[in-house]
């Protein structure tokens, strides 16, 4: 049984871009070697306004971050919304240090990776 939840896609700019407080997400991307890396962000807004077959997002991050470089190379990422418990935030912060290499931070990561099949 998967812990993923199916959420209704909302075709409304304001409902998908206005959050208070702004939620924190863990963005997962693929590294050059095919491994998954995670990075926490709060300045991200997913949009479903470009049409039924297209999704968009606004992400504010350093262009040199692992996340940015992986998205630029692969054109793909997953947004994983997390709860607002202090324990969860502590784990998210551990993934956020600039200059950390995925090979250094991922072995210590407490977030559980879950395989999912999807078509893109």
What kind of feature is each model-predicted range?
Residues 1-37, 45-120:
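Active-site-proximal mixed secondary-structure blocks
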């Amino acid at each position: 049984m998967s812990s993923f939840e199916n959420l209704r896609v909302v075709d409304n700019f304001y409902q998908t871009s206005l959050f208070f407080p702004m939620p924190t997400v863990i963005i997962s991307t693929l590294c050059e070697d095919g491994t998954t890396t995670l990075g926490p962000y709060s300045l991200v807004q997913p949009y479903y306004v470009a049409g039924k077959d297209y999704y968009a997002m606004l992400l504010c991050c350093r262009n040199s971050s692992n996340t940015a470089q992986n998205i630029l190379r692969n054109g793909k990422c997953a947004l994983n919304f997390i709860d607002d418990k202090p324990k969860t935030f502590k784990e998210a912060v551990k993934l956020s240090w600039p200059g950390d290499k995925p090979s250094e931070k991922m072995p210590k990561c407490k977030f559980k990776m879950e395989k999912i099949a999807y078509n893109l």
